[in-house]
Amino acid sequence: MAQAEVLLTKEPAPQSIDVCELPQKKYEVACNTGAYTSAGLATAGFRTAKYLMDEWFQNSYARYHQAFADRDYSERQRHESKQLAAETGELAYRTQLDSTRRVGERLEDMHCWKSELQREIDELSSETDQMMAQKLRLQRALDALSVPFSIATDNLQCRERRQHPDLVRDYVEVELLKETELIRNIQELLKRTMGQAVGQIRLNREHKENCEINWSDKVEVYNIDDTCARYTNESTQVQFYPHSSKFEESASTPETWGKFTQDVLLRAERERLASVNLRKLIDCILRDTAEDLRLQCDAVNLAFSNRCEELNDARQKLQYHLLKILSEITDQEHQIAALKQAIKDKEAPLRVAQTRLYQRSHRPNVELCRDNAQFRLMSEVEELNMSLKVLKEKLQDAEQALRNLEDSRMSLEKDIAVKTNSLFIDRQKCMTHRNRYPSVLQLAGYQ
């Protein structure tokens, strides 16, 4: 009855029969206990075991009244039960309809969040793939840097084999040192960027996994709620679960439930945007480093070209002077031969003059006269000795000049050999090796 009173929502309908007390009719019955009754003392014991008529009527009326009351109560209870059944049926219908609507709303919310999570998962997956591609570009760029670094170091080592006086710290060496330093700095930068890319990929995968876990939970819940929404009173799978109406202690509230998913999406979106920014930064780094390397490579090539022109010009000048020296050596050798011949030519007249003087010194007595012939012979000998002295001095000077010319020739030939060796190193060794320098696409990691 207590449950029925709780479920009633309006006053009971008016009864078909008004509830009232039965009329109490009094009947006058003659008593057999008077002084002049015909009953004797012999009937005194039988009267005590029988009801009086008044009691009989009272008993009948009591039965009527009880039957009427029970019937009336039964009718009221039947009416109230019918009304209660209708009301509870209506209430159960409305409650079930509202529950189904609420479950449907929950399904819509779940579908919305599930779609957002799916979108974020797809975007994170795409972003991670793009970041992996950027990481691959970084690795390719790092691998490509080994070629220019080996070229630059090989050029420096080859140029160490230049000979004196070409073993100088020229602008080619300065540019090569700049190139090696630039390559080292770029390698360090790309390695640090590679570490950042690897860390970002790991974060992307972690947040993608969080989104996938949340999405998987929501798919499971969506299927559960979808199944629940399809249950009807005619469903055969439903049964009683008395303890299912209790709230779990670990159950979340709608606010915490929504905030949890929103936080997961916000963190994933934040990491995805960070990944996008890092990917753009990597693209700029690879483009700028590739351009810087190619500019430095062009600067080194230009320095090599200018230096080779200088060396070739110096060698041509040395060869020109060598030809002049060789020509002068030939002329000087001819001159020395002429001087020697001139000296030789003076020996015969000197012998003649000295012999004449010697023979005339044997003139006897007064014939040993200092005549003009004697004076002339003496002056002739003196002139011839003076000529021989001058010619011998000139011969010595010519021979010294020839020795100087030979030294210059050897020095020029050595310098020409040094310049030829330097040209061979710079042009054949270094510049030919630099033709293997990677392209901009290779340095940018595209190939």
From Swiss-Prot:
Subcellular localization, as worded in the UniProt entry: Cytoplasm, Cytoskeleton, Cilium axoneme; Cytoplasm, Cytoskeleton, Flagellum axoneme
Domain of life: Eukaryota
Keyword match Coiled coil: yes
Disulphide-bonded residues: none
Post-translational modification: Ubiquitinated, leading to its degradation. Deubiquitinated by USP16, promoting its stability.
Alphabetized UniProt keyword annotations: Cell projection, Cilium, Cilium biogenesis/degradation, Coiled coil, Cytoplasm, Cytoskeleton, Flagellum, Ubl conjugation
GO cellular component terms, semicolon-separated: axonemal A tubule inner sheath; axonemal microtubule; microtubule cytoskeleton; sperm flagellum; sperm midpiece; sperm principal piece
Gene Ontology biological process terms, A to Z: cilium assembly; cilium movement involved in cell motility; flagellated sperm motility; regulation of brood size
One Pfam family it belongs to: Tektin
Coiled coil: 114-143, 324-348, 375-423
Similarity comment text for this entry: Belongs to the tektin family.
Function: Microtubule inner protein (MIP) part of the dynein-decorated doublet microtubules (DMTs) in cilia and flagellar axoneme. Forms filamentous polymers in the walls of ciliary and flagellar microtubules. Contributes to normal sperm motility.
Assembly mode: Microtubule inner protein component of sperm flagellar doublet microtubules.
PANTHER family: TEKTIN, TEKTIN-4
Name of the featured protein: Tektin-4
Gene: Tekt4
